[in-house]
Amino acid sequence: MRPAHAKFKGAGSPAPFLLAGRPAPSPIPRAAAARPGDARARAAGEIDDPRRGDTGVSLDTLREIGKQITSVPEGFNAHKTIQRFLDNRKKAIETGQGIDWATGEALACCTLLKDGHRVRLSGQDVERGTFSQRHLVLHDEKTGIKYAPIQHLEESKAPFELHNSPLSEIACLGFEYGYASSDDNSLVIWEAQFGDFANSGQVIIDSFLASGESKWGLTSRMTLLLPHGHEGAGPEHSSARIERFLSLAAEGNMRIANPSTAAQYFHLLRRQALIKKPRPLVVFTPKGMLRQPAATSTLEQLTDSHFHFILDDPSATERRDKVERLVLCSGRIYHDIDGSDQRAEAENVAVARIELLYPFARDQISEMIASYKNLKEVVWVQEEPSNMGAWSVMRRRLIEMMPDGVTLDYIGRPERASPSEGYSVAHVQEQQRIVLSALTPNF
């Protein structure tokens, strides 16, 4: 298997670009990209509002909501599997440990309802969740009666609308965009069954979501949830096409995020509803990570925190001066790297996450890179092929902020026509190669 590798030097001295042995154009000069604090970039919306907003919620409120969304009416006959699901969620909220992705989502939506913000969630399988993670609508196994706990919250000041939609992405996206653009107080969410299927609604994404404000002054808080991740499911169930959304991102027209924990997702949804400047939000959501212990959060993290544009390596605090390679990544690949057997041995490697892909958190990333005084290289790691994912955009953004003597490298799959392998053994081999390469410096 040929490795995909690219290397550039900082300080304006580009080295040859190598990808599967093929030369490519030199990196753009630093002058072509906006500097930190560049007034023009901020005016164009290229730099998101650094005031992250107060998105934390009190423990008492979260626990009270948790009690309500894990309860069923007296005499309701829930299936034993669903009852176990509710009991596990109730225990997580009571103990404050193990808050998973779907629980974070439910708590975010419920707290918005209490604040008076309508929440509307539609998609091809949103009631249950494509991966059986949500279970917002319960069915009495004896009578067939439906019950949605989230629609019966005490002190709710706005309705929660929940709709399993037809298998027509373009029709649903068009309707939901129209709804969102006409009601600024609503958080309108459309979820694809798999992120790959969003391409069936590409006309709405291109003509309205990405450019509606530029053409007609139409703004919205329209939110897309696109399940994404290379987990061996094949080319039609692996990629939400991060590269396509990033290619549409300009002039601050949208927000694009790839959160890696339940708490980050919780704060991201609340921020989207509360932030003063409405923009569409594209979220690349997980599949296997929905139940991954490493991606869970504590209830405390939902109270006194906010959405972080980037997450530095928490394990590097005591060994910052030893770090010579800084790995930058986004989404689920972080957990593959952080959970690998080689992680503990790589003392000179730090692994940081870019949670907000657009607008680019230029100032924060630049400060983080500068804080590693003995850095030799920065590596962008992704599981997507090099002509897909975030690499093309990240390369352009990152090269201009490399300190003197620090190189910018790429590790991931080489250029491909198809998003992923169709053979599980080949997938596992590639994932292992990427993770091992990320933790093995070239010096």
Language model features with spans:
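Flexible, glycine-rich loop/tail regions that form catalytic "lids" or insertion modules at the edges
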Residues: 1-443
